[in-house]
Amino acid sequence: MPLAPPANSVETMASLMPLSPYLSPTVLLLVSCDLGFVRADRPPSPVNVTVTHLRANSATVSWDVPEGNIVIGYSISQQRQNGPGQRVIREVNTTTRACALWGLAEDSDYTVQVRSIGLRGESPPGPRVHFRTLKGSDRLPSNSSSPGDITVEGLDGERPLQTGEVVIIVVVLLMWAAVIGLFCRQYDIIKDNDSNNNPKEKGKGPEQSPQGRPVGTTRQKKSPSINTIDV
């Protein structure tokens, strides 16, 4: 009965067997180099992920990207806890470091994770951040935002006028002043014409004779009438 070869002889035979063409050392080396380049080109995960401007139905998530990395976009995974509602927001060709989350349910718990998008793919997910939306009646105080937070201004806030707006207002005021001045000038001209025509009409009266009597008028004298009756 033939005896099985020892373990060391089996390893020796396996080492002497030719490798398959698909597993040649050259191919393995190229694959390992390619994987190394892809991993090197992927951006790192975002840092300092925070959620601010909490509202009943919206919030704002912001993050930072380590310097020296090429980032062309971001991907945000939003998940509602204890309920359906998963959303992925993806945007490329942008350098923004903040995103508004909308359509949230009030008084609910959510988690978000941010990924950076580079030329060779996405980074690993950043830290998971938990937040809770407010109730419909709750409002944040006006001084709750820190200097580094992204501010969202309402439409009713005071805003200084821009240069273009000031120019438009000045032009409109000048046009109104010109129209009012033209109207006043035309009114003065019409008033002067009326005042020049009235004295001529008032000076005209009935023509008078050299004796001071008006021409065309006769003075009738009344004489007593006498009636004679013959008997």
UniProtKB/Swiss-Prot annotation:
Residues 41-163 are extracellular. Gene3D superfamilies: Immunoglobulins. Residues 193-205 have a biased composition (Basic and acidic residues). The chain crosses the membrane at residues 164-184. It holds the Pfam family fn3. GO terms for cellular component: endoplasmic reticulum; extracellular space; plasma membrane. Disruption phenotype: Knockout animals show no overt phenotype. One of its GO terms (biological process) is negative regulation of inflammatory response. Residues 43-136 form the Fibronectin type-III domain. PANTHER family: FIBRONECTIN TYPE III DOMAIN-CONTAINING PROTEIN, FIBRONECTIN TYPE III DOMAIN-CONTAINING PROTEIN 4. This is Fibronectin type III domain-containing protein 4. It comes from Mus musculus (Mouse).
